[in-house]
Amino acid sequence: MTLSKALEKHKWWCPTSLLLSSNHFVALVLVPLLQNPLEVNVACNICPKKLQYIIFKNPLLSKAFIPSKVGFEMIDRVSQEEGIVLNTIQSKALIGIGSIGEVPVVLAKPQSYMNFSGESVGPLAAYYQVPLRHIILVYDEMSLPNGILRLQPKGGHGHHNGVKSMMKHLDGRREFPRFCIGIGNLPGTMDMKAYLLQKISDTERKQVDAALDQGVEAIRTVVLEGFGSRISRFNIGQKYKYHKV
């Protein structure tokens, strides 16, 4: 579906949510109001632009899975499950337009490196008039064990340069949800860049796949129901997983 067709089909929709995926890059999701504005509980002026999921992907990355790609893989899983094709460039990002359930979304992956990923996020959020609290950032987290998820309604940058860039281009604000996927910490004195770009073991790959499968369901829940208490069900039975409010 082209952007123009999506805008025509959903011209009465108004953007209210934004989901971004940031590993060493950032991916982004935009979600409009539901037919019944009360279901979203947010004030938003009707806007002629259409909102979909947006996914950005850096073409310089290898096809092999490496820790720093886990955020992009999360968005790729969403695009595969929801049948959203990424075929348009906007604001230095590769975007795909479709829907999750009955909610039109834009999946996005910035084409720039991590330190500059906010250059895509800021303009997209402004263009689609997305409230800050409806921006969902998905990214890798070294402070969490491999394959462990963490969901928060807001937070700081945690020394993550991709998140820093995003906050910079959102006027320094931090009140947007985060969806972190653990990639484990540095073993010993290993160089960080080497660690982030190394191929992972089969065991670690299985852990990540399980997290991605669970993450797709979590994102779908957030898009359709909001970032509420039901998200905690994705954290059951795992010591390091938690829904922090």
Where do the language-model regions lie?
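Short, electropositive alpha-helical surface patch
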Residues: 189-207
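Conserved TIR/SEFIR loop-to-helix hotspot centered on a Trp-containing motif
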Residues: 157
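Nucleotide and nucleotide-moiety/phosphate-recognizing core
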Residues: 2-154, 164-179, 186-191, 209-213, ...
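Hydrophobic secondary-structure segments that place a key small or acidic residue at a functional site
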Residues: 160
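Acidic, Ser/Thr-rich low-complexity intrinsically disordered segments
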Residues: 241-245
